[in-house]
Design a protein with these regions (language model features):
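Glycan-recognition and catalytic cores of secretory/periplasmic carbohydrate-active enzymes
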Residues: 1-401
Length: 401
């Protein structure tokens, strides 16, 4: 299918605008978060107060590593590679447990272990960041560490049914409060499974390791068999260890994010049967999110036990742009492209923080007003979702269909 003239023009404008947002706003904000002591400052509150002595999350640093490495690959600005190297050194020297293996959850502002929990989710993001850094500079040490983390995940976290998630410093199984919500004591989550797929996709792309490929295929199969709910065209969120669903939660942002990440995983894996299966699954999910969660301007957050949460979350809008643009490229359905452009329009008008020194508002009311209830930067607020949105849109081929 060929683009119509309006959509082609809209895509060109979209690419120009996200490039400008990336270069003139997102990158400069995160440049200022660099800590000369090592790594990046661990928190800025929603009123833009920098907390220089806040603890530093390993997830934050893995995502920052991914961001600067990927931005360098796109923009070829050598200064971005130095920011990536700064994040890499901190992740390697301070967040990695050389005695027991794996990444800590967080360290102090000076780089000493703070929350020494080992979480499968955390290890996955470290692999993701390390792979991007290897792509950017060819550092074999980074790729070796990524492979070591893969082996650690496989040897330490797997049970009969899949991957357990939360462990002590010495890899004793503990409660999974960090990735559970709504009072549900989840032993397995869609979220961690999705980001294992994301990480293993990149590691397999680089190494073509049979072991990594086999586990990536298994993760895609278990997602289709156990996590995907074909009756409602959605992903279940929380589970016990045997994949029995806990609660009734529908995460709109994770669903639309999953569509493009799983499409990418299938592309990299090259399994024709899985690719065909996921074409149907991901198109169904995208259609459902468009029908249920998109109100014409923005995406709702989630539904829990039948109660809608209409909060406008920064990462949900960003993943919506990427997910719907991918859905358009895969199907040729111009409605998906229109939705992606509408979400970007909302982001420009409301989600981007226009205050001097701000980045993106984390949370907005349904009326588009900032809630100032969540970090401007912190353990979960980083340039991964919005920065990646810019980079993915920038590289989307205008003739992708």
């Amino acid at each position: 299918m060929l683009w119509d003239e309006v959509s082609a023009s809209a895509q060109k404008t979209l690419q120009q605008e996200v490039r400008e947002e990336l270069i003139t706003h997102i990158i400069p904000f995160w440049n200022r978060m660099r800590d000369p002591r090592g790594g990046f400052f661990g928190r800025m509150d929603p009123m833009l107060k920098l907390e220089e002595n806040a603890d530093k999350g390993a997830i934050l640093h893995a995502r920052i590593l991914w961001f600067y490495s990927s931005a360098y690959l796109a923009l070829k600005d050598e200064s971005l590679l130095e920011y990536a190297a700064h994040a890499y050194r901190f992740l390697r020297d301070c967040c990695y447990d050389r005695e027991n293996g794996g990444m800590f959850w967080s360290v102090t502002c000076d780089g000493a272990p703070n929350d020494s929990m080992k979480h499968t989710y955390n290890q996955a993001f470290a692999i993701y960041g390390l792979c991007a850094y290897y792509d950017a500079c060819g550092d074999n040490e980074a790729l070796t560490l990524a492979n070591e983390l893969f082996e650690t995940i496989e040897s330490r976290t797997r049970d009969t049914y899949g991957y357990m998630e939360a462990f002590s410093r010495s890899w004793t199984l503990i409660g999974n409060e960090h990735l559970s919500e709504h009072g549900l004591p989840a032993e397995k989550t869609m979220n961690t499974t999705l980001h294992l797929i994301e990480a293993y996709t990149q590691l397999y792309r680089i190494t073509k390791s049979e072991a990594v490929g086999a586990r990536l295929q298994w993760l895609l199969e278990v997602t289709a068999d156990k996590i995907y709910d074909a009756e409602r065209g959605a992903l279940k969120v929380f589970f016990d260890k045997q994949w029995n669903e806990l609660g009734d939660v529908y995460s709109y942002g994770h669903d639309i994010e999953a569509t493009w990440l799983m499409d990418l995983a299938c592309d990299v894996l090259g399994n024709a049967a899985l690719s065909a299966r996921y074409r149907e699954i991901n198109n169904t999910i995208a259609e459902k999110i468009q029908q249920i969660a998109f109100d014409g301007t923005a995406l709702l957050n989630e539904s829990a036990e039948g109660k809608l949460d209409g909060t406008r979350i920064w990462w949900v809008q960003a993943e919506g742009v990427v997910g719907f643009l991918n859905a358009f490229c895969r199907t040729g359905n111009l409605g998906f492209h229109h939705t992606a452009c509408a979400l970007w329009s909302y982001i420009k008008t409301h989600q981007i923080d226009r205050r001097d020194g701000g980045e993106w508002h984390a949370e907005l009311t349904q009326q588009g007003e900032p809630l100032f209830s969540f970090d401007m930067a912190g353990p979960w607020k980083c340039p991964y979702h919005n920065g990646r949105m810019c980079l993915e849109v920038m590289k989307t081929d205008p003739v992708c269909v």
